[in-house]
């Protein structure tokens, strides 16, 4: 599929897509046939801070709809600002940074 995908233009989609490609390349370099690699679609979450401690978020999971021959998104939203969401956002960011750049 080229263009017209349901994915937002976000750093999270880029990051998750990169990890999927890396896993597939690693398996192919080990000799695993392409047909044996499981199909994977990215996931997405976006946190937005509404003040210095509270955040809201939206997330999406994607699946292939064989009947319609297209990717479908299933979204979840928490628009109730909370400190717990703010803490989750910080934890999410620290986890990504640790994965990309190594432990601080």
Which residues fall in each region the model found?
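C-terminal auxiliary extensions adjacent to catalytic cores
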Residues: 57-104
């Amino acid at each position: 599929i080229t263009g017209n995908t349901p994915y937002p233009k976000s750093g999270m989609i880029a990051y998750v897509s990169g990890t999927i490609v890396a896993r597939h390349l690693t398996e192919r370099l080990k000799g695993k046939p392409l047909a044996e690699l499981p199909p994977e679609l990215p996931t997405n979450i976006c946190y937005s801070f509404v003040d210095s401690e509270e955040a809201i978020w939206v997330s999406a999971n994607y699946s292939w709809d064989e009947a319609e021959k297209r990717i479908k998104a299933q979204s979840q939203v928490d628009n109730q600002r909370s400190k717990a969401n703010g803490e989750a956002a910080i934890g999410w960011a620290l986890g990504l940074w640790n994965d990309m750049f190594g432990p601080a």
